[in-house]
Amino acid sequence: MADDQGRGRRRPLNEDDSSTSRGSGDGPRVKVFRGSSSGDPRADPRIEASRERRALEEAPRREGGPTERKPWGDQYDYLNTRPAELVSKKGTDGVPVMLQTNFFRLKTKPEWRIVHYHVEFEPSIENPRVRMGVLSNHANLLGSGYLFDGLQLFTTRKFEQEITVLSGKSKLDIEYKISIKFVGFISCAEPRFLQVLNLILRRSMKGLNLELVGRNLFDPRAKIEIREFKMELWPGYETSIRQHEKDILLGTEITHKVMRTETIYDIMRRCSHNPARHQDEVRVNVLDLIVLTDYNNRTYRINDVDFGQTPKSTFSCKGRDISFVEYYLTKYNIRIRDHNQPLLISKNRDKALKTNASELVVLIPELCRVTGLNAEMRSNFQLMRAMSSYTRMNPKQRTDRLRAFNHRLQNTPESVKVLRDWNMELDKNVTEVQGRIIGQQNIVFHNGKVPAGENADWQRHFRDQRMLTTPSDGLDRWAVIAPQRNSHELRTLLDSLYRAASGMGLRIRSPQEFIIYDDRTGTYVRAMDDCVRSDPKLILCLVPNDNAERYSSIKKRGYVDRAVPTQVVTLKTTKNRSLMSIATKIAIQLNCKLGYTPWMIELPLSGLMTIGFDIAKSTRDRKRAYGALIASMDLQQNSTYFSTVTECSAFDVLANTLWPMIAKALRQYQHEHRKLPSRIVFYRDGVSSGSLKQLFEFEVKDIIEKLKTEYARVQLSPPQLAYIVVTRSMNTRFFLNGQNPPPGTIVDDVITLPERYDFYLVSQQVRQGTVSPTSYNVLYSSMGLSPEKMQKLTYKMCHLYYNWSGTTRVPAVCQYAKKLATLVGTNLHSIPQNALEKKFYYL
C-alpha cells in the first residue's frame, strides 16, 4: 500500500438530517452484519461522540484486567486513606538529595469554578461536530474559555437563568433552538475538576500538530524509520494533570508508538494459498491485532474476518446503496487496489459500553496498518536492540526532551491562547523535590555479613561466602537428563557446578544420569518418569534450545503430575564464556529449590509475616487466571517461605479467593512456630487502574474482619496489619543531576498525593536507560511504624529475591508471586502439587 493511499486528505464534514450524517472519519459501521455481497440496508457510516466526551464519561472505568499499567498513580481513582493521626508521612533517615522530576508546576492555580451545563438542540442533531459548529456561533457569550463535547458544556461563566435558550444556524442554513441547562458547579476539590483540566491540556496540545492514536498524542512528522524491520517509531507524550501535595502538577512522560509499515493485507498474502487452510490461517494471524487506519488516525482491534464480503459489497448511505470502493474514493480520495479482498470486522467497544448495543466497524485490510509487536518480534534480539537504541533514553536525554516539550507548548500561539483563555500558566522548569538515600543494607551469609554495595549487587561476595542455609547432606540424590550427543557439554556443566557450589557450602554429589537419544518432548517426559522411580530430590534437564512446548511439558510433569523440582538448562549456557558465573547462579537456584536460603538481611521485627500476591492470566484461556500468594515464615527465625496458587476468573480483580490462601499461610506459620504471626505486611501487586475503592471496601475490610475471627478462635488479639498497594508500572521519573538516583532513594513529598499515605522508592540499579521508581500506597496500617521505618522495611524486602544477587524493583514476595503466577498461567495451566509449597520450585 502506497503511503499516499493510506493517508487520504480529510474533507470537511457535511451536515445531513439523516442518520447517515454521522460519517466523519470511521469506516462504515453495521449493527447487524451479514455475509452478503449485496450489501446490508442497515449499514451506514458513523462517527462516535468526540474524544473529550469519552474522556469525561470513561475516565473512572477499569480496563485491561488485573495487570494493567497505571501511568500516573490511578489518575482518577480518588480514595482518602491517609490516617488522620498521621501528621507527616515524610521520613527523616538518610542522606538528603535534591531530585529533578518529570513534572511541571501549574504556576497560576485557577481561582474559578467550572460551570457544568447540559445542551440540547431542536430539531435533534446527530452529528456532534455539527452541534459544536452551531454552538460556536455564541463563543463570545460562552466566554473565552469553554469546552463542549457535543452534549456537555463546561465554562467559567454562569448564566442568570437555569435554562438559557439560544438560536443558531448550521452551514446549511438550518436554524436550531439551543437549550443550555445548568447542571451544577465543579469545584477545585472534586476529581472531575482535574478531568476538565486534563481536557484543557489536551485542547492546548492540539496546537502542536500531534496525532491522537489511542489515548496518547504522537508526532508522525518526527517518526523514526527502522526499514530493515518494516517498522516506524512515533515519538509522543503521555500527560496528566493532578493535585499533588502542594500544587497542581503536569506529569509528562516520553513514549513511543510502534507502527509497522505492513498492512493486514500483507499478512493475509503471506498466509497459505491452500483454500482448505487459508481462512483459518488468516484468522489465526489477524484476530486480536490492533490496527491503525491512517485516514482517520483511529485504532481498532480486529474481531473477525468476513470472507463473504469484499470492497465491492454495498451498504446504504444517505438513501442510496454505495460500495466500499466508491465510499473510500468519495470520502477520502483513496483508491482501493484489490477489490476481492475480504473485509475486517471490529466491535465498537466504546459504543457498546455506552449503549449496550452491538455495533461493528467494517475495515479494509489494505488500509489497516498493524501496530505493536507480536511474540516473534519480541524474541528478535536484533529488532529489540534496534528499537531500544531510540526508546531507551538516559536521564539527560529524557530531561532534555521534557524541556523541549515544555518550550514547544509555551511557544505555540494556539497552545498559549488556550492556556491563557483558562488563566493557566505552566512553570518552564521541571519540578524539584528533596529525596533521601537510605544507607546500604547488610547481606547476611552463613559465615558473616557484607554490605550490599553502592549498586546493591553482591554477586562477587559469593567467592568467599557460604550460603546461609544448605542441606546437611548436600544434594545427594538427584538426576540429570541429557541427549547423548551432548555428553561433553553435560560434563562441562557438572564440573563447573561442582566447583561453584562447593565454594558456597553446597556439596553436590554425582547425579544419576539418564541419557536420551533424541530431544523430542515426549522423550524427556518419559525419561522423567524413569527418574522418579528412584525418588530424586531434583531433576536437571539439559535441552538444546528454548522450545516452549518442551519447557512446559517438563515443568508440568515435575510440578503437576509429580512433586519434583526441575532445573532446565539450555545447551547455549554450557558454551558461555562466563560459565562459572552462570554455574554459581544455577547452584543458588538448586539450593532454593531444595527449600534452603542463600542469604538474608538484618530484620529488627520478630513475629513478622510478609505476603506478596499477584495474578496472571492463562495463556490458554484468557477468561481464566491464577493468583499466587507467597508468605515469609518469620525471616528472623528460619528464613523460609510458603507458596500457594488458586485459579480465579481473569475478571476477578478483587480476588475473592484470597482469604483461603492467607488462611493456609497462617496455618503453615502456626505449624512451624507454634503460634500465629503478630505482624503482617501485605504487599498487593496486580491491582487494576481505578479499583482502589473496591479493593479497600471488599478486600482490605474483609481481611481485617477475617483476621479478627481467626485470631479470636485461639483467644488472641488480631495482628498488626499493613496493606500496601505496589505499583511498578509508573510514568513517574526522577533524576539526580542528570543521572539515575542510586538504590535506596526515597521520595515522600511534593509529587506524592495529599489524600494518600504513599511514597516512591528506587530500589535497584539500571545500567541502561532511566530507572523507574516503584509507588507504594499504604491503604491500611495498624503497625504503628513511623513512615521512615515502613519505607526502610520495604527497601529491605527488595534484597531477598534469590534469582538475582541484587535488589529488585519490588519486594521479593511480590516478585516471587509474579514469577509463580506467570509459571502457572503460561506453562502449567494447573495447580502445582502441595508438597512443593515450601520450596522455591518456581525460580
From Swiss-Prot:
PANTHER family listed in its UniProt record: EUKARYOTIC TRANSLATION INITIATION FACTOR 2C
Report the outcome of V130A.
Abolishes binding to CBX5
Please list where the region (Interaction with CBX5 and papi) is annotated.
Answer: 1-257
* Residue span of motif Nuclear localization signal: 1-12
State how changing R10K affects the protein, per the record.
Abolishes binding to papi
Q: Which Gene Ontology cellular component terms are annotated?
A: chromatin; chromocenter; cytoplasm; cytosol; euchromatin; germ cell nucleus; heterochromatin; nucleoplasm
| UniProt effect for mutating R7A | Large decrease in binding to papi
UniProt-annotated stretches for the region Disordered:
1-76
BP GO annotations: female germ-line stem cell asymmetric division; germ-line stem cell population maintenance; germarium-derived oocyte fate determination; heterochromatin formation; male germ-line stem cell asymmetric division; oogenesis; piRNA processing; piRNA-mediated gene silencing by mRNA destabilization
The record's gene field reads piwi
Compositionally biased tracts (Basic and acidic residues): 41-72
Domain PAZ, residue spans? 263-372
* Keywords (A to Z) from UniProt: Chromosome, Cytoplasm, Developmental protein, Endonuclease, Hydrolase, Magnesium, Metal-binding, Methylation, Nuclease, Nucleus, Phosphoprotein, RNA-binding, RNA-mediated gene silencing
Impact reported for R9A: Decreased binding to papi
Q: In which tissues is it expressed?
A: Expressed in ovaries (at protein level). Expressed somatically in ovariole terminal filament cells, epithelial sheath cells, cap cells and follicle cells (at protein level). Expressed in nurse cells and oocytes in developing egg chambers (at protein level). In embryos, accumulates in pole cells (at protein level). In larval and adult testis, expressed in a germinal proliferative center at the apical tip containing somatic hub cells and mitotically dividing germ stem cells (at protein level).
Cited InterPro entries: PAZ_dom, PAZ_dom_sf, Piwi, RNaseH-like_sf, RNaseH_sf
Question: What terms describe the molecular function in GO for this protein?
Answer: chromatin DNA binding; metal ion binding; piRNA binding; RNA binding; RNA endonuclease activity
Q: List the SUPFAM superfamilies hit by this protein, alphabetically.
A: PAZ domain, Ribonuclease H-like
Result when mutating R11K: Decreased binding to papi
Q: What does this protein do?
A: Acts via the piwi-interacting RNA (piRNA) metabolic process, which mediates the repression of transposable elements during meiosis by forming complexes composed of piRNAs and Piwi proteins and governs the methylation and subsequent repression of transposons. Directly binds piRNAs, a class of 24 to 30 nucleotide RNAs that are generated by a Dicer-independent mechanism and are primarily derived from transposons and other repeated sequence elements. In ovarian somatic cells, mediates silencing of transposable elements at the transcriptional level in a mael-dependent manner.
Main subcellular localization, coarse class? Answer: cytoplasm
This protein's name: Protein piwi
Instruction: Name where it's found.
Output: Cytoplasm; Nucleus, Nucleoplasm; Nucleus; Chromosome
Where does this protein come from, organism-wise? Answer: Drosophila melanogaster
